[in-house]
Amino acid sequence: MKNIIYMAPMEGLTDFTFRNAYEKIFGKGKIANYFTPFISPNKSEKFLAREIRDIDREHNNGINTVVQVMTNDAKDFIWTARMLYDEYGYNEINLNAGCPSGTVVSKNKGSGMLNEPKLLDKFLDAVFEDDFIRENIKVSVKTRVGVETDTAFPEIIDIYNKYPLEELIVHPRLRTDFYKNDLNLEAYDYAVKNSRSKVVFNGDIFTRKNFLDIKKKFPQTD
């Protein structure tokens, strides 16, 4: 089976300059998708200059780029998707439901969306009720397994299962873990066994051995 490798986004690091340099020197067609640092929609319904530079097709020529969006407002997600499709030609958007930053979580964005699963459900329901989204946009989600505990993770998976996600990218840590503590591989295993969407592993892949160990433990995952 062919290995599928993505480059996860890191704010302030993996901009278009980095992505293009990495692809030219190391990637060479081996990276299936490069994810942009998140766009955070604003009420002006316009992208910031730095966001425009990062998503400009001329700056992403020859690489498969997926734009990540962070919002808890379905209307903001939809206009962002429409603009990305109409003006920049993107037909896949990744929802950030994983960022652990305190300033993000305090606004119930990023992994803060997992605080209230019913609101997450309401958000996704509104997104997929939109005709434009259903007809034109592939929506994937980057998620964690909970905020302070993983007890609600089965409920969160049930919510994701209600919608036709392109894929579910799981970082198997809690929001309170940030990027420390051990990966919760039991929670990831639950996602693999119970998700209706394709599940993609994210987190702590620092070496080839890390990668091969995960592939061995979860051969059905990307």
List the model feature ranges, each with a label:
Residues M1-D222:
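Flavin-dependent oxidoreductase catalytic cores
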